[in-house]
Amino acid sequence: MQQTPAKLVLENGSVYTGYAFGHIGETGGEVVFNTALTGYQEIVTDPSYAGQMVVMTYPLIGNYGVNQSDAESQKIWASALIVREMSNIHSNFAATGSLDQYLKEAKVMGLAGIDTRKLVREIRQKGAMRGVISAIDPDEKRLEEKALKIPEMTGLDLVKKVSTSQTYTIDCDDAEYHVVAYDYGIKQNILRMLQNAKCKVTVLNANTPIEEALKLDPDGIFLSNGPGDPFAVTYAIDNIKKLAEHNTQQKPVPLFGICLGHQLMSLAFGAKTYKLKFGHHGSNHPVKNLKSSSIEITSQNHGFAVAMESLPESLEMTHLNLYDQTVEGVRHKKLPCFSVQYHPEAAPGPHDSHYLFEQFTAMMDQAKENV
């Protein structure tokens, strides 16, 4: 197979030369790495990766192809996929095509044949950086200048880019609960997990006023994952503040947040967030449940975190990351509100934290009993 030469140039001038697959062109974004061994299709279709180019640390990617059921959204959101070796052969009974063709049809670039271990070490040491991949412009200095012009992730609201434009409902035949989900970049497996928990789910645009959500008479409200800087999503923070005020004055509506939703809920109650050096991206992060002292292996995908020292008196930390001692979960001491930084629905990843969806339904049951 003929290979098209391509380069990745980082904002600090580092150059990685390989070959392009998927779409042949030029693209840019923040370069981050993911330590999952499998799940590349779920990763590139996760809206949380909007504006980012993902480096897979596992050396061989594409060997089991792609299929529609593994997609976490309707399109590829990652700006590019960077791998050590791209498999030209896929073997999987469920595969409907190759990763190369999948990226090509979506006009998304891939870069292979580079030293991904060296690249990941550089990101770990220096932090996530902006970069440009090009198969059409060989001028490294010009590509470096293009990388420097890419907006930094700090201060960037990408939720507006990925959120649904229309309200839609996912029915459940044996539904016992009605959940309103704010779509900041929601993954399909989250919706499946809510369905499995016997929830009918109404999905709203991220900018929908909380008053409109409450008119739907939900049993609970869910705050989804999503991309970008949580501090920039001011309309979502204001919505959660209004919901908290509603919950103190009227019948409380339970609230559950995941990833960006966790950060937004924490900000609404007075905590602060900050950008991690290179983020948490992978399916093997150990998290300690501070109540049970059990250890959960979790799937994570976030570049920002809640500052532990900023947690207000009203919030209690419930989960702790054992890699870097960062906040992985909080709950409100008086209101029926809780959130986690990681992805209990996984996809890809372990299932250690599925119990959190049961915790959400138990909270909704209790709210019904207290009416």
UniProtKB/Swiss-Prot annotation:
GO terms for biological process: 'de novo' pyrimidine nucleobase biosynthetic process; 'de novo' UMP biosynthetic process; glutamine metabolic process; L-arginine biosynthetic process. PROSITE patterns: GATASE_TYPE_1. Residues 1-174 are annotated as: CPSase. InterPro entries: Anth_synth/Amidotransfase, CarbamoylP_synth_ssu, CarbamoylP_synth_ssu_N, CarbP_synth_ssu_N_sf, Class_I_gatase-like, CPSase_GATase1, GATASE. L-glutamine binds at residues 48, 226, 228, 260, 263, 301, 303-304. Its EC number is 6.3.5.5. Signal peptide: none annotated. Small subunit of the glutamine-dependent carbamoyl phosphate synthetase (CPSase). CPSase catalyzes the formation of carbamoyl phosphate from the ammonia moiety of glutamine, carbonate, and phosphate donated by ATP, constituting the first step of 2 biosynthetic pathways, one leading to arginine and/or urea and the other to pyrimidine nucleotides. The small subunit (glutamine amidotransferase) binds and cleaves glutamine to supply the large subunit with the substrate ammonia. Belongs to the CarA family. This is Carbamoyl phosphate synthase small chain. It comes from Prosthecochloris aestuarii (strain DSM 271 / SK 413).
